[in-house]
Amino acid sequence: MESTEKLTDTNAILAYLYETFPLCFVAEGETKPLKIGLFQDLAERLADDSKVSKTQLRVALRRYTSSWRYLKCIKAGAVRVDLDGNPCGELEQEHIDHAQATLKESQDKAKAKRAERSKDEGDAADKAPRKPKRKPQPQARRDAKPAAKDKPKAAPKAPAVPINLVPAKLEELKVAQRVNVKLGMSPVAGSIVDINKGDVHVQLDSGLTVKVRAEYILL
């Protein structure tokens, strides 16, 4: 004899009721108010059905009748039905008032939970470490000139040059020779680092290297 698997999940039991009693239990859309004492009828009709137990049927029925969809159908003029969809009398005002109060309470609780969840998410976002804002520089610092360390070093003063310097001849010059270069009004001391044809490369004492013709070299 094949054993029948018992349904334990409430959603699966509701799906079974939708299929077995489609005129009573509505899967989608507007539901119908159920007959008072329907659980007893349901237990008797499914007494030999090994798929469901009375306990699970009670849980499934409670979920069905506490849903917003069901509570909204409890209104004036609605008629209760039995397992086969047969009418079993109109709703009493007391039951309508109770259903509306239950619906409002449930919706208010859901709204409060959503608000609390949004607040918690907002608090979590506020507590998350944020990148510190860059402190604005004072106007005086923004307008200040670059630091002295970024400037090229001032050229040291050239040593006093004798007044009897004369232009050199190319053949008199050699690498590493100390010479003076005529730059502007005053000669500047330096050392020859290279001689290429008629051009003489001189590294001045300031660190600057210049290329001049031999006639600008003073000895």
UniProtKB/Swiss-Prot annotation:
Keywords: Chaperone, Cytoplasm, RNA-binding. It comes from the Bacteria. GO terms for molecular function: RNA strand annealing activity; RNA strand-exchange activity. Pfam families: ProQ (PF04352), ProQ_C (PF17516). InterPro entries: ProQ, ProQ/FinO, ProQ/FinO_sf, ProQ_C. SMART domains: ProQ (SM00945). Its main location: cytoplasm. SUPFAM superfamilies: FinO-like. Belongs to the ProQ family. This is RNA chaperone ProQ. It comes from Shewanella amazonensis (strain ATCC BAA-1098 / SB2B). The lineage of its organism: Bacteria, Pseudomonadati, Pseudomonadota, Gammaproteobacteria, Alteromonadales.
